[in-house]
């Protein structure tokens, strides 16, 4: 008889009310990362244990919030958490009239990461979510670039691809900090809840081990992309970047090899997303083409000196 995970056809997150409280229920499903049910059950158990560890840790509290588990069933790969008050930072960027001047949530996002990274990693924690993904960043980026051709996207040409991977390899070899820490792996504005005082990350389904700058650079990358999607926004990207890195305790990290390397990775992955995801309308197709053009320019800019 198929297991609960094998019977599901897609992931689900649904909002329900229990005893007068709003609850979000999440179901893990095959194809989220692997077609191996054992991997899915393990990752569900891992997320449950992490959320419980966060709940009892003295590193959080006050303005650094944590998700509260309402119910969990690792055998069914399901987790229910209490609703977090406020709005996501994705909504904050688009809707709050103080977004141009209020840097507090961004500083707290960096500070939350600093506390998160101080937690001990379990011995069986891996650096990848899927067994199909390489752990080496050069191989990982090479796989994403090769995949572009599989979707019929004839970029980059072989010389440019080689230059990009050489650049990433050089930056990797010059990274000073090779330590491994907890990585949320989807530390995007939409997964950071803000109620005006407390910053609370949600959705730890992709958590893994990784480099200290991975989450911070991903958050900064997503903010930078907002100005590509919506150039009319009054968004102080440079100030937000500084606030995040100050909160993390690494105010000059944007000058490091690790920062530059991870930003190239994020840009390659963002390009891959905008190539493989079909547009739902003509207007969306034009928008996606613009985003791809910007990302290509930025990647080309990173290696232009080596192509002369």
Task: Locate the predicted segments by residue.
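C-terminal subregions of glycosyltransferases and related glycan-biosynthesis enzymes
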Residues: 11, 133-152, 243-244, 248-277
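Active-site activation/catalytic loop segments of kinase-like enzymes and analogous catalytic loops
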Residues: 214-251, 265-284
């Amino acid at each position: 008889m198929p297991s609960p995970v094998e019977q599901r056809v897609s992931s689900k997150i649904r909002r329900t009310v229990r005893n007068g409280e709003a609850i979000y229920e999440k179901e893990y499903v095959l194809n989220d990362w692997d077609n191996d049910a054992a991997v899915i059950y393990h990752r569900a158990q891992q997320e449950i244990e992490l959320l419980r560890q966060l709940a009892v840790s003295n590193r959080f509290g006050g303005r650094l919030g944590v998700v509260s588990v309402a119910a969990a069933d690792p055998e069914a790969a399901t987790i229910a958490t209490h609703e977090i008050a406020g709005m996501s930072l994705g909504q904050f960027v688009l809707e709050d009239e103080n977004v141009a001047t209020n840097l507090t949530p961004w500083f707290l996002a960096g500070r939350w990461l600093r506390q998160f990274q101080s937690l001990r990693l379990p011995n069986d924690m891996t650096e990848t979510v899927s067994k199909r993904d390489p752990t080496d960043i050069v191989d990982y980026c090479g796989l994403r670039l090769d995949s572009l051709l599989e979707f019929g996207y004839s970029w980059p040409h072989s010389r440019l691809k080689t230059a990009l991977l050489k650049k990433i390899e050089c930056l990797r070899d010059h990274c000073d900090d090779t330590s491994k820490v907890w990585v949320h792996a989807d530390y995007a504005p939409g997964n950071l809840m803000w109620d005006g005082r407390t910053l609370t990350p949600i959705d730890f389904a992709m958590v893994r081990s990784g480099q200290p700058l991975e989450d911070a650079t991903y958050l900064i990358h997503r903010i930078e992309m907002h100005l590509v999607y919506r150039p009319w926004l009054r968004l102080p990207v440079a100030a937000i970047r500084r606030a995040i890195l100050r909160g993390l305790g690494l105010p000059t990290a944007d000058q490091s090899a690790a920062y530059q390397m991870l930003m190239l990775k994020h840009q390659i992955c963002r390009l891959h997303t905008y190539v493989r995801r079909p547009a739902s309308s003509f207007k969306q197709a034009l928008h996606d083409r613009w985003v791809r053009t910007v990302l290509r320019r930025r990647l080309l800019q990173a290696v232009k000196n080596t192509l002369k």
